[in-house]
Amino acid sequence: NIVITGMGGSALAGLIVKKWLENEITLPIEIVRNYNLPKSVSKNTLVIASSYSGNTEESISALTQAIEIGAQVATVSSHGKMEEIARKNQIAHVKLPTGLQPRMAVIYNFRALTKILVNFGINSNEKHEEIEHYADFLRKESESWAASVSNERNYAKQLALYSAGRSAVFLSSSAFSPLA
């Protein structure tokens, strides 16, 4: 089994990975948003502890438990205590870019989680490369959302202007439920 620990945007990235891969891998993925790992965690479990700051108490607590259990462990953070623990224990660590708001780091976290699953032999590299393709597309597409782009050519501005003073309701298929 696979356990991804995290709060806020880190948990959101885990939920997206879980949905993205639910028909691709046979191992169950559980997202843990608290201090304690489930009793099902064993030496055969892959525990990925994620915290943008690297200092989230809940994620560090779960990481410490995973190390004590002897689970397979990887970490994701921009810096902080989590990175220090990973270095000290020779644990695989993916370093996220610094200087972002944690929610803005979700896409980086998502990519890190999928790459860890590739490195542990759980996910195919082709599926990870698919993410890179979408990231390139979104990078180019988002240029049209810049403040300097006129309203006529900027769908983000048009949506914002249309939505002003209204309540937003987001509907989604289950595939996109973590994003809704």
Place the predicted regions along the sequence by residue.
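A short, well-structured juxtamembrane/interface segment
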Residues: 1, 149-162
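A short glycine-/small-residue-rich loop at the edge of a beta-strand within enzyme catalytic domains
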Residues: 125, 129, 150, 174-175
